[in-house]
Amino acid sequence: MPIHRIGLIGDFDPEVVAHRAIPLAVELAASDCAFSISADWMPTEYLRTASEKVLQGFAGFWCVPGGPYRDMDGALRTIRFAREKRCPFLGTCGGFQHAAIE
C-alpha cells in the first residue's frame, strides 16, 4: 500500500495542543480509511526556499493552527502552490486565515 504524504504547514510547538493532536488525528483517520499516511511538519522558514520538486512529493497540505508563523511568505508560497496545482488543501484556524490572505 503506498504512503500518502501530507505536508503540515506550520512551525511545530509542543506547547500547542493542536500540534500534538494533529499527527494522532491523521493517524486515526488513515486507519479508519485503510490508508497509509505520513504527516510531515514543514516549518515555514524552510518553505520559503523549498523547491517545487519537494512540494510535489506531497498528496496534500494542511495549514495548521498556531501563529504567528515564523515566515508568513513561506506559508503563503506553499498555499499558492497547492491552489495552482489543484492539490488537496485544508487550512484551520490561522491556516484558514492565511489561505484567505493568499
Model-derived features: where do they sit?
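N-terminal beta1-alpha1 cap of cysteine-dependent amidohydrolase-like domains
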Residues: 1-102
